[in-house]
From Swiss-Prot:
The family this protein is said to belong to: Belongs to the glutaminase PdxT/SNO family.
Biological function: Catalyzes the hydrolysis of glutamine to glutamate and ammonia as part of the biosynthesis of pyridoxal 5'-phosphate. The resulting ammonia molecule is channeled to the active site of PdxS.
GO-annotated molecular function: glutaminase activity; pyridoxal 5'-phosphate synthase (glutamine hydrolysing) activity
Source organism superkingdom: Archaea
GO biological process: one example: pyridoxine metabolic process
Active site (catalytic residues): 85 (nucleophile), 179 (charge relay system), 181 (charge relay system)
Transmembrane segments: none
Gene: pdxT
Cellular component annotations (GO), alphabetically ordered: cytosol; glutaminase complex
Protein name from the UniProt record: Pyridoxal 5'-phosphate synthase subunit PdxT
HAMAP family per record: PdxT
Catalytic reaction(s) noted: aldehydo-D-ribose 5-phosphate + D-glyceraldehyde 3-phosphate + L-glutamine = pyridoxal 5'-phosphate + L-glutamate + phosphate + 3 H2O + H(+); L-glutamine + H2O = L-glutamate + NH4(+)
């Protein structure tokens, strides 16, 4: 049975839990999606989602709750991890605009700009092209970070807004600028969870 954990310290956790449950159903896979708060919940975990929210807060709480090092280790060992918005920042190797005390998992060879799109008023929705699906995907961007550079050959673009890369994959790791959990479309979650089944 698949066990998916959504890091539930801050951010849009419930939306990811619902999206992951629907995605597993659509894939015909039996599994459980849990609200991940403590390191002991990582036992037998199949995949992890790091939601949007505020990256400084998520970073601090992951360290405080003892999740930071075990999640980093699992990612390095090949466990599928997907980060959206602030989750992408948490996964990135280099972050422009980070605060000095912020720690990052550094599992994804990308450079991101932390608040590239500005304040809440600059949030928008636009169709995204996906590498793994012919139909456009409804991309919801909320004070999104921006992927400014791919730092290694291992990073593959999987989502585009026009000609700009807004989603990437590196082996077991997926990082997205946008919020797939805020739509009724589960294609991105299904693509990610196929790595775990």
């Amino acid at each position: 049975m698949v066990k998916v954990g959504v890091i539930g310290l801050q951010g849009d956790v419930e939306e990811h839990i619902w999206a992951a449950r629907r995605a597993l159903e659509n894939l015909g896979v039996s599994g459980d999606v849990i609200w991940l708060k403590k390191p002991e919940q990582l036992e037998n975990i199949s995949a992890i989602i790091i939601p949007g929210g505020e990256s400084t807060t998520i970073s601090r709480l992951m360290v405080k709750n003892g999740l930071f090092e075990p999640v980093k280790k699992l990612g390095e060992e090949g466990l599928p991890i997907m980060g959206t918005c602030a989750g992408l920042i948490m996964l990135s190797k280099e972050v422009i605009g980070a605060t000095p005390e912020q720690k990052f998992l550094e599992l994804l060879d990308v450079k991101v700009n932390r608040n590239a799109y500005g304040r809440q008023v600059d949030s928008f929705e636009a169709p995204i092209k996906l590498a793994f699906s012919g139909e456009p995907f409804p991309g919801v961007f909320i004070r999104a970070p921006r992927i400014v550079e791919l730092l290694s050959e291992r990073v593959k673009p999987i989502a585009w807004l026009g000609d700009r890369v807004v989603g990437v994959e590196q082996d077991n790791i997926i990082g997205l600028e946008f919020h797939p959990e805020l739509t009724d479309d589960t294609r991105v979650h299904e693509y990610f969870l196929r790595k775990a089944v």
